[in-house]
Amino acid sequence: MSSEPLVLGIETSCDETGVGIVRGHTLLADAVASSVDEHARFGGVVPEVASRAHLEAMVPTIERACETAGIRLYDVDAIAVTSGPGLAGALMVGVAAAKALAVGLGKPIYGVNHLAAHVAVDQLEHGPLPEPCLALLVSGGHSSLLRVEDVTSGVDPMGATIDDAAGEAFDKVARLLGLPFPGGPYIDRAAREGSTVYVDFPRGLTSRRDLERHRFDFSFSGLKTAVARWVEARERSGEPVPVADVAASFQEAVCDVLTRKAIDAASSAGIEDLLIGGGVAANSRLRVLAEERAAARGIRVRVPRPGLCTDNGAMVAALGAEMVARGRTPSPLDLPADSSLPVTEVLV
């Protein structure tokens, strides 16, 4: 098969129905249908609502991607789909659609890991991944540090959150501040008008004692609780809550820990390239702080454009294309949707 295979990727791990089409490392189409507005009134993603939205959006999104790419479905060399981790019902919709396409078109199918796909998508913007590289993946469901020797098979965890993920903390703090869902973009926007030192919020797992056991792990539940208590105390006193200042101080605490641990992990492993991905990677302060700290340690930083950081089908197609190009054996047609798929299992 061609070293630049034409691959269609399907992503349905959470609330975005994503269909991407790539040829090798070239992005041809990235169609996304989001159900975020349906979840906003609940203040978070509702699994049943997400699954139903995927069912409704799947065919139109596939059609839109093919039209944008200027191809017909039977032109593709392979189908790739997120098999996990994610919401079980949502994953099942994507996997079922991918299986139907694979059978109907007579094409191989590749069930891939959602987290590894967040790493692979960077190739669409910056070319082949340096190997090894360190990946910092931060989203609503994950906060992980990964050593990547080979994005198709050699992904090993160095650290992860022990409680709340960074993106989850952003959503919960946004709710405390009266900001809309999803909270990340709104906190980022509000923080631009605030002071990063207005409140000295705690940095989880950064004490000397914590670093002995959790050097590269994250914890954001304590930070979330600290913000809640600060806001509640302010409201009890009858004083207005300075939303911009609290947003900036909270965001600084998160970005400080993420970048500090990522740079430390890369340095300790002798890795000179840091890749940042996941929805929180779109945060402007995280990008700036990572660049500053990495430059001071001689580490190069790669961050995809914001549209490729959030969940999308292009990242799945990118990883699928890499699987095909490297001659990986396709997945069986009975591949499962695995909501707790470990990152070490890149191909199902």
UniProtKB/Swiss-Prot annotation:
Belongs to the KAE1 / TsaD family. Its EC number is 2.3.1.234. This is tRNA N6-adenosine threonylcarbamoyltransferase. GO terms for cellular component: cytoplasm. Pfam families: TsaD. Signal peptide: none annotated. Required for the formation of a threonylcarbamoyl group on adenosine at position 37 (t(6)A37) in tRNAs that read codons beginning with adenine. Is involved in the transfer of the threonylcarbamoyl moiety of threonylcarbamoyl-AMP (TC-AMP) to the N6 group of A37, together with TsaE and TsaB. TsaD likely plays a direct catalytic role in this reaction. The keyword Nucleus does not apply.
